[in-house]
């Protein structure tokens, strides 16, 4: 976590079946880009947030339901889904052959404990925790994306406010946990 997250230059280390499938997809696009000269942007999205789904929903709903929050994956990145959608379209102008890698997420490294405590303030509840924060986490450094396109339009604190309001208003959920706390790739 102290490194600021993995940049596009870091060789991926795919842990678990899902991560391996994502890496395989990248390799196929890289092959096509090299073999056929097709311009490609490898859009590496980390934790897009929507009100019915996402790591913020997972944390907020646990705080609201007074369920303990696992701390082993002590921090994460996230970005508003609308900003991610815009960046997906805008990233087409960066496409290159060989393929261009682009990490896409928000600028903050967000502490799970901090996010839970922020939701606790909004809900008037004290979050419960289990485990201890590990010294590492799955993080992206999206500074290249921010240099190319600027910072996301929706801030982290705005996402926290919207998520809390959604849950307080009884908003719906997709019932698909992100498993952000998973450290061994078993989703």
Residue ranges and their predicted role:
Residues 17, 21:
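Active-site helix of classical SDR
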Residues 44-48, 70-79, 100-110, 132-135, ...:
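Glycine-rich Rossmann NAD(P)(H)-binding loop
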Residues 82-93, 161-164:
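Amphipathic alpha-helical segments that line or abut small-molecule/effector binding pockets
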Residues 81, 112, 152-156:
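Amphipathic alpha-helical segment in the mid-to-C-terminal domain
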Residues 87-144, 182-186:
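Mid/C-terminal beta-alpha module of Rossmann-like enzyme folds, strongest
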Residues 1-16, 35:
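Active-site "gating" loop of Rossmann-like NAD(P)-dependent oxidoreductase/epimerase domains
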Residues 15, 26-83, 119:
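NAD(P)-dependent short-chain dehydrogenase/reductase
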Residues 156-187:
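Amphipathic terminal alpha-helices
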């Amino acid at each position: 976590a102290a490194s600021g997250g993995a940049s596009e230059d870091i060789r991926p280390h795919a842990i678990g079946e899902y991560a391996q499938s994502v890496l395989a997809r990248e390799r196929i696009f890289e092959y096509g880009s090299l073999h056929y000269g097709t311009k490609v942007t490898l859009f590496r999205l980390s934790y897009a947030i929507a009100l019915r789904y996402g790591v913020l929903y997972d944390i907020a709903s646990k705080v609201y339901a007074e369920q303990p929050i696992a701390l082993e994956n002590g921090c994460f990145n996230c970005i508003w889904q609308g900003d991610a959608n815009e960046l997906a379209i805008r990233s087409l102008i960066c496409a290159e052959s060989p393929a261009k890698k682009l990490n896409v997420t928000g600028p903050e490294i967000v502490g799970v404990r901090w996010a839970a405590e922020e939701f606790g303030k909004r809900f008037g509840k004290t979050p419960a925790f289990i485990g201890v924060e590990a010294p590492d986490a799955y993080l992206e450094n999206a500074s290249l994306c921010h240099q190319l396109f600027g910072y996301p339009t929706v801030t982290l604190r705005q996402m926290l406010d919207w998520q809390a309001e959604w849950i307080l208003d009884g908003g719906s959920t997709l019932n698909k946990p992100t498993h952000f706390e998973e450290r061994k790739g078993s989703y």
